[in-house]
From Swiss-Prot:
PROSITE patterns: CARBAMOYLTRANSFERASE. This is Ornithine carbamoyltransferase. Keywords: Amino-acid biosynthesis, Arginine biosynthesis, Cytoplasm, Transferase. One of its GO terms (biological process) is citrulline biosynthetic process. InterPro entries: Asp/Orn_carbamoyltranf_P-bd, Asp/Orn_carbamoylTrfase, Asp/Orn_carbamoylTrfase_sf, Asp_carbamoyltransf_Asp/Orn-bd, Orn/put_carbamltrans, OTCase_ArgI. Gene3D superfamilies: Aspartate/ornithine carbamoyltransferase. The keyword Lipoprotein does not apply. Reversibly catalyzes the transfer of the carbamoyl group from carbamoyl phosphate (CP) to the N(epsilon) atom of ornithine (ORN) to produce L-citrulline. Belongs to the aspartate/ornithine carbamoyltransferase superfamily. OTCase family. It comes from Thermotoga maritima (strain ATCC 43589 / DSM 3109 / JCM 10099 / NBRC 100826 / MSB8). Pathway: Amino-acid biosynthesis; L-arginine biosynthesis; L-arginine from L-ornithine and carbamoyl phosphate: step 1/3.
Length: 313
């Protein structure tokens, strides 16, 4: 099957087929090898990327900015002080203006509706760098990291521990379903996966021979796991719920005992970062030999560069 993603936006991986995701991962491998050899091809020379941030960022900003600049492009950082989406000027009109000025737009903020409207009205590729609902570029980096470790994706068992309805867990569940993996969400009933996306993923795995499931039982979830993944207990904008979340999620902390419960010495630990060491994960695990969080963070750049290559060239 010939894959052509030119002009496409990345808003959620629900919009992408397994073949298209595979295409992006193959480009990611290529650009990572180029990066290792310090090869710079200036693929984006003469192009401009608008990067709109409603939420602060380390990895997403670094990944988009370095990926675009390394290839000769000009990234423009726009903070809430620089651009007011929907204030004084409608979001639709701002999108139209941006589309006349730049070649692509990255948005990191709150509402999924915002990134969708930017894509609808700008006429250029738009990339979701994180919304309250989805984090697709993180999920691509997660897939790349898993494949680097196991040489495959199909059949790999991934367990997400903690707040399983957050944007990272949601996008990881979609990615695993699309690629025929076995995804287990493990957390309290109060924070189980979004029912609409969970149902969509249950339909997807019928075609990909994967599986998606939810349980609050650690032993059931962790048995035979290849990957144990977690995220902060209170996401950005939810800091006021931290005490409540700590009480709910303490049983789901990833520690050495949890890693041993997989029954596999080759199980790896992943985290999208930033991490609160001592809360969702212990220092010993995130700094231990099973941790792949730094590879995962680096792979944000390579997968993001791959997305831009595929959609702009």
């Amino acid at each position: 099957m010939s894959v052509n993603l030119k002009g496409r936006s990345l808003l959620t991986l629900l919009d992408f087929s397994p073949e298209e995701i595979r295409y992006l991962l193959d480009i990611s491998k290529q650009v990572k090898m180029e990066n290792r050899s310090k090869l710079r091809t200036e693929r984006f020379k003469g192009m401009t990327l608008a990067m709109i941030f409603e939420k602060r960022s380390t990895r997403t900003r670094l990944a988009f900015e370095t990926a675009f600049a390394e290839e000769g492009g000009h990234p423009i950082f726009l903070s809430p002080n620089d651009i007011h989406l929907g204030a004084k000027e409608s979001l639709e009109d701002t999108a139209r203006v941006l589309g006349r000025m730049v070649d692509a737009i990255m948005f990191r903020g709150y509402k999924q509706e915002t990134v969708e409207k930017l894509a609808e009205y700008s006429g250029v590729p738009v990339y979701n760098g994180l919304t309250d609902e989805f984090h697709p570029t993180q999920a691509l980096a997660d897939l790349m990291t898993i494949e680097e470790n196991f040489g495959r994706l199909k059949g790999v068992k991934v367990v997400f521990m903690g707040d399983t309805r957050n944007n990272v867990a949601t996008s990881l569940m979609i990615a695993c379903a699309k690629m025929g993996m076995n995804f287990v969400a493990c957390g309290p009933e109060e924070l189980k996966p979004r029912s609409d996306v969970f149902k969509r993923c249950q339909e997807i795995v019928k075609e990909t021979d994967g599986s998606v499931s939810f349980t609050s039982n650690l032993e059931e979830a962790l048995a035979g796991a290849d990957v144990v993944y977690t995220d902060v207990w209170a996401s950005m904008g939810e800091e006021d719920k931290e005490k409540e979340r700590m009480a709910l999620l303490k049983p789901y902390q990833v520690n050495e005992r949890v890693m041993e419960m997989t029954g596999k010495s080759e199980t790896i630990f992943m985290h999208c970062l930033p991490a609160v060491k001592g809360q969702e994960v212990t220092y010993e695990v995130i700094e231990g030999k099973q941790s792949r969080v730094w590879d995962e963070a680096e792979n944000r750049k390579h997968t993001i560069k791959a997305v831009m290559i595929a959609t702009l060239l």
